[in-house]
């Protein structure tokens, strides 16, 4: 067994003992990061230099303390993107890619206006901009730390990153009736929910919690979408897996939407709700 293989086996055992959900995958990704190679190339590395091995062991020790893998390597994958992440910004989750797939499948004008509310790293906005290069894509975020990451990730793209609070009354009235698609992965976890250490200790609370019932940001987003969307425009909002019915009710109670649909992610859990703006009378 090579030195690297031995080190990865030891790291896997360490991470498993620490309660990491995917110890082997994390060990291999940390090894690849330390060596500066793709994970698939690890099998071709026989004898890593001592500095790389020491760096790997340092990262494993940090991961065993439940520091997020993405913070340790500095990036997170989302759809077609690799995004810069770190302390102060919510790490994009694979579950949100189900919402992305739905959004990509929508029939929109070539020059559509798309708004991503609570953009965080810019994940949804940037992925949609890549799929729809002719669209105007606006990413809205109110956290200064998250805005830094969003602007960094959006550098060199056409995505417009705006600093604004999505719960503020009369936000951006110039968009009233002009938006084709609104998407959002907002703070939605009900206060008091039990979370893994990676989330509770390292994701910003501002990006996680949506008030006592998880709906404190979702309800204003529904009202905002009703104002911004053109007739027939589409909206998709992610929610906690315990609040699907509440999110459906928020759209239904607003009275400006039809085709309100609860949707699931790839694991089969309730994940987001979609709706269509009804025509104005």
UniProtKB/Swiss-Prot annotation:
Organism: Mycolicibacterium smegmatis (strain ATCC 700084 / mc(2)155) (Mycobacterium smegmatis)
A GO molecular-function annotation: protein-(glutamine-N5) methyltransferase activity
Keyword Transferase appears in the UniProt entry: yes
Free-text function comment from the UniProt entry: Methylates the class 1 translation termination release factors RF1/PrfA and RF2/PrfB on the glutamine residue of the universally conserved GGQ motif.
Protein name: Release factor glutamine methyltransferase
UniProt: S-adenosyl-L-methionine binding residues: 141, 185
Residues noted as binding substrate in the record, renumbered to the chain: 185-188
Matching InterPro entries: DNA_methylase_N6_adenine_CS, HemK-like, N5-glutamine_MTase, PrmC_N, RF_methyltr_PrmC, SAM-dependent_MTases_sf, Small_mtfrase_dom
Catalyzed chemical reaction(s): L-glutaminyl-[peptide chain release factor] + S-adenosyl-L-methionine = N(5)-methyl-L-glutaminyl-[peptide chain release factor] + S-adenosyl-L-homocysteine + H(+)
């Amino acid at each position: 067994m090579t030195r690297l293989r031995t080190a990865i086996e030891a790291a896997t055992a360490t991470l498993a003992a620490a309660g990491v959900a995917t110890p082997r995958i994390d060990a291999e990704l940390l090894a690849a990061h330390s060596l500066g190679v793709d994970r698939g190339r690890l099998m071709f590395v026989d004898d890593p230099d001592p500095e790389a091995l020491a760096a790997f062991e340092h990262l494993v020790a940090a991961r065993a303390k439940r520091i997020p893998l993405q913070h340790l390597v500095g990036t997170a994958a989302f759809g077609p993107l690799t995004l810069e992440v770190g302390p102060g910004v919510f790490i994009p989750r694979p579950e949100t890619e189900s919402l992305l797939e739905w959004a990509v499948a929508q029939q929109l004008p070539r020059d559509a206006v798309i708004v991503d509310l609570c953009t965080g790293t810019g994940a949804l906005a940037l992925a949609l901009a890549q799929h729809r290069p002719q669209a105007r894509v606006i990413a809205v975020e109110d956290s200064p730390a998250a805005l830094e990451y969003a602007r960094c990730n959006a550098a060199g793209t056409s995505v417009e990153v705006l600093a604004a609070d999505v719960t503020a009354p009369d936000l951006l009235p110039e968009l009233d009736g002009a938006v084709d698609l609104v998407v959002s992965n907002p703070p939605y976890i009900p206060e008091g929910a039990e979370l893994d250490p990676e989330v509770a200790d390292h994701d910003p609370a501002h990006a996680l919690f949506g008030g006592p019932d998880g709906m404190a940001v979702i309800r204003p987003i529904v009202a905002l979408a009703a104002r911004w969307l053109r007739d027939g425009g589409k909206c998709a909002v992610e929610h906690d897996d315990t609040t699907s019915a509440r999110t459906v009710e928020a759209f239904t109670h607003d009275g400006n939407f039809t085709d309100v649909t609860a949707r699931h992610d790839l694991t089969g859990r309730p994940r987001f709700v979609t709706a269509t703006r009804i025509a104005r009378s």
